[in-house]
Design a protein with these regions (language model features):
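Single transmembrane alpha-helix segments in multi-pass membrane proteins
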Residues: 5-73, 93-100
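Transmembrane helix-bundle core of multi-pass membrane transporters
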Residues: 102-166, 193-196
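Alpha-helical transmembrane segments in multi-pass membrane proteins
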Residues: 4, 30-38, 54, 58, ...
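Juxtamembrane helix-boundary/capping and inter-helix hinge elements in multi-pass membrane proteins
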Residues: 46, 99-103, 129, 178-180, ...
């Protein structure tokens, strides 16, 4: 990464400018938040291939909620997050209770989410706009000029570190990732943790 930055700075004097770096960090923030959830799933020894359409479904349902008026605008973010959590719970149930390989069940959930969104939109681009809160998080910035999206990424990252290193849930995630059966025999509620992890990733 350092080498890329150095080479880029040779071609453009503004490549390493604070404004450009903050812009790139704002773009990276969205992927960073998504990657945080995916990382916890990987620590379980599983994989989540439903990310593309779970993210798309959450965003599309959030913007759809905005079209419901003031109440819908206030509930837009909870609706989007709830949609992701619901799809994550489906994936988690398939892995934890039905014992379907995570690669298979999450790929299926991804396809189902895609189909549901096509039915919801009729195959056309959604026409509803984002809510003020969504625009504030996505494009706003603090008084210091730091993008709000970057602040959210930092908060999510700190919360993930705390969850994984300072809680029983985090220790159980690592234990399941090392050997699920051993974690189960030691008394850990492995199924609940697996479902919760996929819900968090959603």
């Amino acid at each position: 990464i350092v080498l890329v930055l150095l080479v880029g700075s040779l071609y453009s004097s503004s490549f390493l400018s604070p404004d450009y770096l903050l812009q790139q960090l704002k773009v990276a923030s969205f992927l960073g938040v998504i990657a945080t959830g995916a990382m916890i799933v990987i620590l379980l020894g599983q994989i989540d291939l439903s990310v593309p359409w779970v993210v798309a479904a959450g965003g599309m349902m959030a913007t759809a909620a905005t079209g419901w008026g003031p109440v819908g605008s206030a509930l837009a973010i909870p609706v989007g997050v709830g949609c992701g959590v619901a799809l994550g719970l489906v994936s988690g149930a398939g892995v934890a209770y039905l014992r379907i390989p995570s690669m298979v069940v999450t790929l299926a959930v991804n396809a189902v989410a895609q189909g549901l969104m096509i039915v919801h939109t009729g195959g056309f681009s959604p026409q509803d706009a984002s809510s003020p809160a969504m625009r504030f998080i996505a494009t706003g910035q603090t008084v210091l000029g730091i993008p709000n999206a970057l602040v959210v990424w930092v908060i999510v990252g700190i919360a993930a570190v705390f969850l994984l290193t300072r809680t029983t849930f985090g220790r159980t995630v690592y234990a399941i990732g090392n050997r699920e059966r051993a974690a189960y025999l030691s008394g850990a509620r492995t199924r609940v943790v697996i479902m919760s992890t996929f819900a968090l990733a959603g």
